[in-house]
Amino acid sequence: MANCVATQQIHQKYGGVVPELASRAHQEQIVPIIKEALSDAKIELKDIDAIAFTRGPGLMGSLVVGVSFAKALSLSIKKPLIDVNHMKAHVLAHFRETAGTEPTGCPFLGCTVSAGQAHLLEVTR
């Protein structure tokens, strides 16, 4: 598929993420980044099987932007909607195939750090 990133430089001068600015930036960037991902993957919306969105944890404003967009898109193209735990997704991304590689299995050590929380996980199955 595709891996696209939208960087929010506006937070640099504050030394951390400002929730209101983050949600506004999400609103501005969500359509362009989805168009870029579809283009990079050389697919169209009709080619996808489902719409996944982050249900949390995360900043409320940014989560609302994501779930609202995902629900609208899901309804408009008649595809199922899947809610995903943000932190679990980072750990489980270990199993995703990327170009030229195969995912490795368990056991492995996972580490997530977000908003002042850190988790070190031993994944055995």
What would you call each of these model-derived segments?
Residues 1-125:
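Short acidic/glycine-rich loops and adjacent helix/strand connectors
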